[in-house]
From Swiss-Prot:
This is Small ribosomal subunit protein uS7cz/uS7cy. GO terms for biological process: translation. It is found in: Plastid, Chloroplast. It comes from Phaseolus vulgaris (Kidney bean). One of its GO terms (cellular component) is chloroplast. The lineage of its organism: Eukaryota, Viridiplantae, Streptophyta, Embryophyta, Tracheophyta. Part of the 30S ribosomal subunit. It comes from the Eukaryota. PROSITE patterns: RIBOSOMAL_S7.
Amino acid sequence: MSRRGTAEEKTAKSDPIYRNRLVNMLVNRILKHGKKSLAYQILYRAMKNIQQKTETNPLSVLRQAIRGVTPDIAVKARRVGGSTHQVPVEIGSAQGKALAIRWLLGASRKRPGRNMAFKLSSELVDAAKGSGDAIRKKEETHRMAEANRAFAHFR
């Protein structure tokens, strides 16, 4: 156990246009090689595409997509007596959001298409509707946790 105090949890800053922490978290995950302005550009173009596709508030679509992809439970590898078991573990809201964002971006990067803004907007709209690769990933994680329910006492 650390002799120092516990580290304070950093609160995410909000972005300049939507004034939303979730948007800023997404921008920070899109970010590659320190090019934050490009990450903002990609996300804002994606939001504009969502606005044109759905004719609703893109922020509500984003929230709905992340809420749909956020897992409640995941599996964690735990070594017990020489064999490794996949132990189901409940996930907190912050970690769940982070996983959801990671899965959404991973799924949108894998999509075939012209540019990242287009792929991201398509994935967010699909996730908000309840389909897409990110939703499939969440369901797969939940299935894994359900299949390994017998090892829940190893926590």
